[in-house]
Amino acid sequence: MKWVTFISLLLLFSSAYSRGVTRREAHQSEIAHRFNDLGEEHFRGLVLVAFSQYLQQCPFEDHVKLVNEVTEFAKGCVADQSAANCEKSLHELLGDKLCTVASLRDKYGEMADCCEKKEPERNECFLQHKDDNPGFGQLVTPEADAMCTAFHENEQRFLGKYLYEIARRHPYFYAPELLYYAEEYKGVFTECCEAADKAACLTPKVDALREKVLASSAKERLKCASLQKFGERAFKAWSVARLSQKFPKAEFAEISKLVTDLAKIHKECCHGDLLECADDRADLAKYICENQDSISTKLKECCGKPVLEKSHCISEVERDELPADLPPLAVDFVEDKEVCKNYQEAKDVFLGTFLYEYSRRHPEYSVSLLLRLAKEYEATLEKCCATDDPPACYAHVFDEFKPLVEEPHNLVKTNCELFEKLGEYGFQNALLVRYTKKVPQVSTPTLVEVSRSLGKVGSKCCTHPEAERLSCAEDYLSVVLNRLCVLHEKTPVSERVTKCCTESLVNRRPCFSALQVDETYVPKEFSAETFTFHADLCTLPEAEKQIKKQSALVELLKHKPKATEEQLKTVMGDFGSFVDKCCAAEDKEACFAEEGPKLVAAAQAALA
């Protein structure tokens, strides 16, 4: 290995090192500094997001009042940095403002106790009370004309309400990215409110944006969980693999610098430091664009855009081409007689280099798989470097990777075939059965939500070319399973889920895949309520109808976990016919009341 490069790699693991997002000199007034850097519009948006993510139950108007007060205070500090309280940290200033909310105790209960603490404990306390499942339901889009009227009457309020509604539903949303989506939202309404058919223009665009927003939220939640539960090292390893795939022409020293900056930025956003996070993200985009020649040939178009679009574009940019004539991996990591010496002198650096070199050569692998391979390589070196003949011991380490690569390949192949055979709804139901049998203690709404999300892997990834399927599918599954882990952590009910969620971030998906039917589960009593429905079912949107049916399927399995596929098919078929019949009846409610008990009796007989 080239030792000049090796020494430069040490900088990756020195948390103080960073040329782009540097630790700035202390400013007399932090809030004035951030206001000047970000500008009033972005400052206001970020403060609104911060308050909405902490105080998720408060009405929009209350947040607007707080934002106005903080903004006016910041302007005062810009005019005179030595004015009263301008020297306070952002946590102190925003925390003090949160604690002035009169309804804090009534709305948030013990969260009000946080206000008795001093910083930094107070902010940590607020973070612990963020609710990943606040129960507000999906954002309902009002009628197109009403939306356009509201947009034209007060654009700033309209977009502020959008930021508020997303932020309070997603308390870990990546704040600068949410400002970007608000700009996109504005663009949709600017265009569609001038269209002849406003609804025809708005509906598909708003739906497409909603999907992007939900995906963005889930990805950032995984990053925050990675930092919070597994530490900075885990996040940096993930980032090394991802950026090495995306920027394979960049030197490792460059990748290491970007990774260090990214870790700082995401730590700030996950920690509620949204002004610092957005400011540092803008600095990183600036650095990347100034140094694009040494990073990627694909960045030129991104770098001509305004700051929010620029950062988003860089995060989504296509992979660069692999450099020609890369030496075989084995040269530095198997055949070199100094492998153990290099490893033992700087373990994380040596493994970081391995991960970089392996990832840039394998854009078709998922990040999770690359990290599992690095873990296997580390375990092999730990074992072999303690033997009398290390080179002989680790000579075939790359052969040991084969089962680790084949397992997700086979899983994706099998599940894509099942998806192609059953379609998305049928595939979701197959996963629902699979996961309810594995972890029946998990609540029915969570099992339905997670299985529906897992089922979307088919339409998201199985339609991709073969070379892209694995990366797409496994990285998507990591994001969805993190949602299960986050919800389960709040109300833990299954030791199996806790074990898979907490033992290893990179092995979460294989851990869940390997779970068998839980033989220790004591079945629930049969409840007629499971099949008690009313006429309102008929007017529900298709997705909500599916959720009702899928909830019934889960409850059936919790009652009869050993039910065969044939039995389930019979009962769910009867259920479908029952719904169709009553929704077509003249007196729907009477039909549901009369036919419901018959369905219950038939279901009990079928499952007996």
Swiss-Prot record:
The modification Phosphoserine is found at S29, S82, S89, S443, S513. It holds the Pfam family Serum_albumin. One of its GO terms (cellular component) is extracellular space. Residues 19-24 form a propeptide. Cu cation binds at H27. The modification N6-methyllysine is found at K558. Residues 1-18 form the signal peptide. The keyword Cytoplasm does not apply. It is found in: Secreted. The modification N6-succinyllysine is found at K229, K460, K588. It comes from the Eukaryota. InterPro entries: ALB/AFP/VDB, Serum_albumin-like, Serum_albumin/AFP/Afamin, Serum_albumin_CS, Serum_albumin_N. Keywords: Allergen, Calcium, Cleavage on pair of basic residues, Copper, Disulfide bond, Lipid-binding, Metal-binding, Methylation, Phosphoprotein, Repeat, Secreted, Signal, Zinc. The keyword Repeat applies. GO terms for biological process: cellular response to calcium ion starvation; cellular response to starvation; negative regulation of mitochondrial depolarization. The modification Phosphothreonine is found at T444, T446, T570. Ca(2+) 2 binds at D37, D279, D283. Its main location: secreted. GO terms for molecular function: DNA binding; enterobactin binding; fatty acid binding; metal ion binding; pyridoxal phosphate binding; toxic substance binding. Residues 19-210, 211-403, 404-601 form the Albumin domain. Binds water, Ca(2+), Na(+), K(+), fatty acids, hormones, bilirubin and drugs. Its main function is the regulation of the colloidal osmotic pressure of blood. Major zinc transporter in plasma, typically binds about 80% of all plasma zinc. Major calcium and magnesium transporter in plasma, binds approximately 45% of circulating calcium and magnesium in plasma. Potentially has more than two calcium-binding sites and might additionally bind calcium in a non-specific manner. Interacts with FCGRT; this interaction regulates ALB homeostasis. Interacts with TASOR. In plasma, occurs in a covalently-linked complex with chromophore-bound alpha-1-microglobulin; this interaction does not prevent fatty acid binding to ALB. This is Albumin. It comes from Felis catus. The gene is ALB.
